[in-house]
Amino acid sequence: MAISKERKDQIIKEFATHEGDTGSTQVQVAVLTADINELNDHLRTHKHDYHSQRGLMKKIGHRRNLLAYLRRTDLPAYRELIQKLGLRR
């Protein structure tokens, strides 16, 4: 269910704002989005896994808060990130 270390490193490299960046808001949102997508796939096959469903809801809430923060502080970066991740239509 969790994303692999290789996939996580790939996401970090893609969304990092500078060398060694692992904690910027953009990186955190991208990693959470990958986790959320993995959990969604898991829950499609295991519909009654309520423990994982709760974890999914917590991750979605965390991502929502990070996106709200990014929108408040850096609107162009927010727009670029949601376009890159395909979160809004």
Swiss-Prot record:
Q: Which UniProt keywords apply?
A: Ribonucleoprotein, Ribosomal protein, RNA-binding, rRNA-binding
One Pfam family, short name: Ribosomal_S15
Which cysteines are cross-linked by disulfides? none
Q: Which GO terms describe its molecular function?
A: rRNA binding; structural constituent of ribosome
Keyword Transcription regulation among record annotations: no
Q: Which GO terms describe its biological process?
A: translation
Gene Ontology, cellular component aspect: cytosolic small ribosomal subunit
Q: Which InterPro entries match?
A: Ribosomal_uS15, Ribosomal_uS15_bac-type, uS15_NS1_RNA-bd_sf
Q: Do you know which Gene3D superfamilies this protein is assigned to?
A: 6.10.250.3130, S15/NS1, RNA-binding
Which family does the record assign? Belongs to the universal ribosomal protein uS15 family.
Assembly behavior: Part of the 30S ribosomal subunit. Forms a bridge to the 50S subunit in the 70S ribosome, contacting the 23S rRNA.
What functional role does this protein have?
A: One of the primary rRNA binding proteins, it binds directly to 16S rRNA where it helps nucleate assembly of the platform of the 30S subunit by binding and bridging several RNA helices of the 16S rRNA.
Q: Which HAMAP family match?
A: Ribosomal_uS15_B
Task: State the name under which the record lists this protein.
Answer: Small ribosomal subunit protein uS15
* Species this protein is from: Limosilactobacillus reuteri (strain DSM 20016)
